[in-house]
Design a protein with these regions (language model features):
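Bacterial N-terminal signal peptides that target proteins for export
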Residues: 1-8
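Start-of-domain marker
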Residues: 23-118
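Surface-exposed amphipathic alpha-helical segments
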Residues: 133-157, 179, 185, 297-333
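Signature of long, low-cysteine stretches enriched in small and polar/charged residues
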Residues: 74-126, 130, 237-295, 310
Length: 333
């Protein structure tokens, strides 16, 4: 892939830390508590209200990208070390600051399933407050990615547990692999090169488009190429409610592209806003574009949300996580 906008590499070490394989011990653990996207931060009150707490909020509660209204990346709450009782130990995501002048080593420890399952526990060890602030800032991306991956893994595990297997078969027939679609998702449209699958509720709509086109261009993964193909497919296949209306990509805020390698698959991730031409509907989208097997086609999985009455962070995180569940079909034995 050319013209790298940015590159994100989730290391094998981090993925191993965040894996959710249930072993004998995990089977005995209680289920996690808390709402999706929540993090409990175990730190004393003075540090929470000072520079260290500000750093935590900047890193974990900054604005979630490409949402029309401001929403925090995660919802964070403070618990003091003395108040960190059993009730809080079973929370889904926990960030613990262990500040001890007599400690043996500074750094960050990533663990899962310490007190519950599936749980993400991150511990920052430091000799003093300044050291804790430095370590937090130095490991900002990795800490945020660890929590994001833990949230993503829970969604994917649920999708696999309650999977609509027939949808995966349909997608695999067209592109050679498929995400895992949980119960509630239905097939809306299918052509030779375009599939529309959605979970439609009364006031929300979470959809995924899967489409492909020949990899004939020198710059298949530039923003211009990705958006041009996206708009062409949407105009042809996704009409609006009224005549002369269709879904397209909003240019009010320019989409961004970054290249990601995740569990062996390299893809261009595009974030932006969709809208309906000649109408007033819109919302966020995120897409993954990558070469098909043999590199003859470009495959695009495009996840989007319509939820005008509600915050959209969790709706988008849910449908985006399904893109990360994509797997190539295993060869027939």
């Amino acid at each position: 892939m050319k013209k790298l906008v940015s590159f994100v590499l989730l290391t094998a070490t981090l993925l191993g830390v965040l894996s959710c394989n249930r072993g004998p011990r995990k089977a005995l653990l209680p289920n996690v508590s808390g709402k999706a996207g929540e993090i409990i931060v175990v730190i004393d009150r003075d540090n929470w209200e000072g520079n260290l707490g500000n750093a935590v909020r900047d890193i974990l509660a900054g604005d979630c990208p490409y949402l029309a209204q401001k929403e925090a990346l995660f919802t964070i709450a403070n618990v003091t070390p003395t108040g960190f009782a059993d009730l809080f130990k079973v929370h889904r995501n926990i960030l613990i600051f262990n500040i001890d002048p007599q400690g043996q080593e500074e750094g960050v420890i990533y663990r899962n399933d310490v007190w519950a399952h599936p749980q993400c526990v991150i511990q920052v060890n430091a000799f003093d407050n300044d050291g804790a602030l430095r370590i937090m800032n130095e490991n900002a991306d990795r800490i945020a990615n660890a929590v994001e991956q833990a949230e993503r893994d829970r969604i994917i595990a649920n999708a696999k547990l309650y999977e609509e297997v027939n949808l995966a078969k349909i997608v695999t027939e067209m592109v050679g692999g498929s995400p895992h679609f949980p119960s509630g998702y239905k097939l809306k449209k299918r052509t030779d090169n375009f599939i529309w699958i959605a979970d439609e509720k009364q006031y929300t709509n979470q959809g995924i488009f899967i489409y492909k086109y020949p990899a004939a261009e020198a710059e298949n993964f530039t923003q211009e190429s990705i958006i041009a193909h996206r708009n062409a497919f949407l105009k042809e296949n996704v009409p609006g409610m009224f005549d002369n209306t269709w879904m397209t990509t909003s240019d009010f805020v320019a989409p961004t592209v970054e290249f990601i390698r995740f569990r062996g698959l390299q893809f261009a991730q595009t974030r932006g806003f969709w809208e309906v031409h000649n109408d007033f509907m819109g919302g966020p989208f995120v897409s993954h574009s990558f070469y098909g097997q043999g590199a003859n086609d470009v495959i695009v999985m495009d996840a989007w949300v319509y939820a005008p009455r509600y915050d959209k962070r969790q709706y988008l995180r849910q449908v985006e996580s399904l893109l990360y569940s994509f797997e190539w079909a295993k060869p027939a034995e």
